[in-house]
Amino acid sequence: MTKNQEYALQYADYAMAQMRRYGIPASVTLAQGILESSNGQSRLARNENNHFGIKATSSWIAEGGKYGIYTDDKPNEKFCSYDSVGDSYEHHSRFLKENSRYAGCFKLSPDDYKGWAQSIEKAGYATGGKYAENLQKIIEQNGLQKYDRQVMQEMTAQGRQFGVEHN
């Protein structure tokens, strides 16, 4: 089993829960986590439970959000710090859902991982090039689409809609 597959297996439940809640493909969430956190091994992931490289905004800090200081694109940047990896996954989903620049993503089907990857890149999620291509490669090489299929089948069988809270 590859490190990417180990990461996916460890965090698939979080990604699938986010797919049910927000309609974001689990495969894309996992691929972003793999890429952004170096399979959960980056300093940011290990020290702050931040698996998606989300920076701490002034509103995050004003609301009492914790943060760590790291050098990324610039020295001494503030990154969100979370109590758990699950909190990181939830904040990542809310970050995409509540940020208008990602609105186009939510017009796509929850199982359209290629469209989602391209739309996330187009909206400017990452500063590096070929972001969508890298996400798709991670998804396809590690069979992460199986998590999307599992959630799609489950939601269809239960007659449930994505993006609607279910008790």
What are these regions (language model features)?
Residues 1-167:
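Catalytic cores of secreted/periplasmic lytic hydrolases that degrade extracellular macromolecules
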